[in-house]
Amino acid sequence: MRPRHLLLAVGLAAVWGFNFVVMQVGLRHFPPLLYVTLRFTLAAFPALLFVGGPRAPWRWVLAAGATLGVMQYGLLLVGMRAGMPAGLSSLVVQIQAVFTVILATVLLGERITTRRITGMGVAFAGLALIALTLGDGSPTGAFVLVVASALCWGVGNIAVRKAAPPDSFRFTVWLSAVAALPMMGLSLLFEGVPHLTFSLEGTLSVLYVALISTLGGFGVWGFLLRRYDASVVAPYSLLVPVFGMSCAALFAGEPLSPVKLLAGALIVCGVLYAGTRPAGRTAAAPAEAGPAGPRPEPTGPHRERTAPRPRPDAPDTPDALSRTR
């Protein structure tokens, strides 16, 4: 990866990691379901007027909107409102990668290797360590909600794979539009008619998560995926919890205990081990034109989780929506 693109990938991980602190700030001003509604409404409109159709089967667009939009973010924000710290949330949701592997094996018949089983076991050990050391500051119920959010994320990844969107940014706009109306209904049902007093802090929080993290973030992610294989770009998403926990410690005063650091290392290393091939093991694949000439199409676990490319110039891969943001 070229140096400026590497900086772009690291910067995007920082934006998505800081996003958890921003969401925690937003929850001081808005109920969680209303906050998600505002996020997706602002991300969808007016962009929806300019991007055209989703260019994917509607049943999978609706399924992705329901799981990745309504259920994932609804559960995540309710869990954070219930007491789950921002930094810890950014770490726990990374277990979605493990759920995705399990669901792809069960629902799509993908092959599961010993390496993946080992990596998933290490990641779940880190998750169990967090669960066993939760104190009064992080209620068990809030932890369960965030884990459930990660599970919904895994289900949503399967829907995205089936949708196989050629343009991740356009798909993100439509996903946001699909999620906005159900979230508004759920907010009215469970939180009542809101009595809003817009503050500068709350408004900036909504603008950040909608425009910078969602639209800008996935725009950059798609830009990188158009120039490099998913197996090159995807590992940078593992920097998200690193930035998330660091930003939470720096800006929100969230303590970084040795147990949290150990659990974080187990989850990140487990996910990374399960999602990469051993060094030196490559498979022959047809060449694909790139900015620096022909390059092989991704192989191994990342290739298995990415929908087949119907043509060599497809701009994005559906894996664009399968990483934390």
What residues fall within each predicted segment?
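Hydrophobic alpha-helical transmembrane segments of multi-pass membrane transport proteins
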Residues: 10-18, 22, 62-82, 102-103, ...
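Hydrophobic transmembrane alpha-helices of multi-pass small-molecule transport proteins
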Residues: 41, 47, 103, 112-132, ...
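Hydrophobic/aromatic residues within transmembrane alpha-helices
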Residues: 26, 35, 79, 106-108, ...
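Juxtamembrane helix-entry segments on the extracytoplasmic side of multipass membrane proteins
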Residues: 1-6, 28-33, 37, 53-59, ...
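Transmembrane alpha-helical segments that form core, pore/gating elements
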Residues: 43-47, 100-101, 106, 137-192, ...
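Cytoplasmic-side transmembrane-helix entry/capping segments in multi-pass membrane proteins
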Residues: 57-67, 112-124, 142-143, 166-176, ...
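Signature of the 12-TM Major Facilitator Superfamily
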Residues: 34-38, 60, 88-91, 114-117, ...
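C-terminal-most transmembrane helix of multi-pass membrane proteins
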Residues: 36-40, 132-133, 202-204, 238-325
